[in-house]
Amino acid sequence: MNPLIRAARPEDVPTLNAIYGHYVEGCTCTWEEADARLFSREGLARREERYPVLVAEIGGEIRGWGSLSPYNLRSGWRFVAENSVFIDHRFHGKGLGKALLAALLDRARSGGVRKVIARISGDQLASLGLHRAMGYREVGRLREAGFKSGKWLDCVYMERDLGTAQP
């Protein structure tokens, strides 16, 4: 499958939130437990260009999204971003996550980001595998740091060194 990767638009917000909402309700890939509206039209419009939200379209329908966010708001962290990728559960295994993550890494490079961080629940083997395949390496693990769905979860920290930013 060759998805169209493009910047998210305000009218995409309901679909982005619906995709995310599926995982809030039934998955440990996000540790959010309550009904969450990750995006708003206003918030999406105000995002810095350096921290995009991208969507993957197939046949004109959004089937996944990915974003870059500041890893930490303190100024010394300005060269580090965190990525998130969520795929419509009906479209797993079709290369959408890889396409979105590749596009996010390209945008990070062009935006002066030096490292991209991913925080992944230790039981999410597909996500861990995707990030490894895209050149990320595990740099830390917080054991039993989160609790969801009746169980304690590890948080795996992975990084991709882009080595491009200069202060």
State what each model feature region is.
Residues P3, E61-W65, L153:
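Glycine-rich phosphate/pyrophosphate-binding loop shared by adenosine-nucleotide-utilizing enzymes
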Residues L4-A18:
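A short beta-loop-alpha structural element at the N-terminal edge
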Residues N17-D35:
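Helix-loop element at the rim of GNAT/NAT acetyltransferase active sites that forms part
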Residues C29, E33-R90, L101-A102, R107, ...:
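Acetyl-CoA-dependent GNAT
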Residues S67-P70, I117-I120, R132, R137-D154, ...:
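Conserved catalytic-core motifs of GNAT/GCN5-like acyltransferases
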Residues H92, A118-L128:
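Conserved beta-strand-loop-alpha-helix junction that forms the acyl-donor binding cleft
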Residues G93-D106, G129-A133:
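Conserved acetyl-CoA-binding loop-helix of GNAT-fold acetyltransferases
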Residues A108-I120:
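Conserved GNAT acetyl-CoA-binding A-motif
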